[in-house]
Amino acid sequence: MTHFTEPKVIYQEANPYGTFTAYLEDDGRTVYLYLQGEQNPEFGIKSVWVCNRVEAPDKRSAEDLSNGLAPLLLHSEVNEPKPQPAFEEKELYFIWTEEGDGVALFYKEVLVAFLPSWSGIKGFHGYSFHAKIEALTAYPLGNSDFGIIPDRVRASRNFWEARSKQGAWKEIQEKRLSFLESKFGKHDKYWSADGGKYPQLGIARFQSEKFPEILIYSTIGMSAQNMPTVELFHKDYEDYARIELILAVKIGLEGLERSESWVPHLIGELIRFPWNMAKWFGHGHTITMSRKDPEALYLNFTSVLFRDFESFSLLNVPDLSGFISENGKQVRFLTLLPVSEEEKEYAQKGGIQSFNRMWDEKGFSWYHNSERQTLI
């Protein structure tokens, strides 16, 4: 009969965003690294085998599986079949990925495991220094100092060190405000939008002489860190991972302040979404509107469509290209276009290119008009 002890969490830590928690668990047989989402129940729990704490067996035990025990790696799957000693908590620490949905485990300053954002896809778990071959719950990490994984972890360490420097947020904030003010003129309102949590974020409002009929609201700071999971969809993910959102609204009959009742709140609910949910925003994406437009006249706007400013064929669209983030990559500015349920379904079925072409042909603009007619 297999003897086992109650699993013990020997190290635990939340990511800097406060949205994911990683913990290291030792059940006397194995040590596993786990990652769970705090705000997205769909994320579930991801895991990677770190090491065996008992002699590596030649085959897996059906009894272990029936008892719900974490799988051991076999003699043929590990670098060292002998039991690994217990970890000393004081020698453990995590380095989180910039995106916050992946974590590296260090022990005595050595990288021993990495649980990346693509963990959980097609049966993949993560990487372990003690894995010899591609096994059930771990792939080999290889060299802990050189290679793609160590380089990536090193880049994450450098990112967090840079962000922890005094004055880092002020530089980030001023750089973005300066760029937007070169396009729209001085901002006339600013809200802190991070709720006192990391990352620091804000919303700025502009009344531009170039666009006197509209109010322009922009996020400040989203582009200072990569969004999660972009690399699952784009090989050159760093070209898509940094964005700022803009929601511009045509000034209605009720004046400037009417938009204040919903626009900053809507943006405020979107601004942390990527890091809260481990999801990303990109050109052609849609998301349900959490706030209603009180000035909507003909349409019930239920979703917002994200559209890259560079995709418009219209005249009089601001040129927001050329802004480079701290990582040397260009920032993509996405405008938020409220759409009806019918318009959203049309875009999803017919394709975003067809939808955008029709939008431009009908002369709809890059900003939101509460009184517009339906596109379809």
Predicted regions mapped to residue ranges:
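Short linear motifs embedded in intrinsically disordered, proline/glycine-rich low-complexity segments
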Residues: 1-376
